[in-house]
Amino acid sequence: MTQKAKNTIYLLILIILSMLCLVYASVPLYSIFCKVTGYGGTVRTTTVTQSKLGKTTIKIRFNADINKELPWKFYPEIPYTTVKPGEQKLIFYRAENLTNEYVSGMAVYNVTPYKVGKYFNKVACFCFTKQTLSPYQKTIMPVSFFIDQVYIN
């Protein structure tokens, strides 16, 4: 085999390995991109303290769709709340395992309209981690959030 053929084989192997690495890394990189920019309605998470409250009141509606294969009851305690930009709010979701087995689930959250997602900041949320409910367990799960004051501009 000539040196040129060996170099071509090495190059092809390098390209294939690079493509595999890119495929493997694309999902976490896209997730990071969405969290940083708020792209596609993905909310940003933060630990920032409250700033001076805005005067505008915003109505936030909560939804709880569930995968048909997940044997849970899952719903927000209140269907909506009002919040002023910069004001931190705490709301709760309720979940109940309807089976006699341990069942785990993880919330996928989104904000619509999508252009508002970058202003919706979750401080703490059950949706950051997988939730496991024991047989027939009922639980209350908190969500703490605020709307960035930049939204009113």
Swiss-Prot record:
Transmembrane regions listed in the UniProt entry: 9-29
Similarity comment: Belongs to the COX11/CtaG family.
Membrane topology category: Single-pass type II membrane protein
Cytoplasmic side: 1-8
Locations listed in the record: Cell inner membrane
Highest taxon in the source lineage: Bacteria
Name of the protein this chain belongs to: Cytochrome c oxidase assembly protein CtaG
GO molecular function: copper ion binding
Function field: Exerts its effect at some terminal stage of cytochrome c oxidase synthesis, probably by being involved in the insertion of the copper B into subunit I.
SUPFAM superfamilies: Ctag/Cox11
Organism of derivation: Ehrlichia ruminantium (Cowdria ruminantium)
Entry's Gene Ontology cellular component terms: plasma membrane
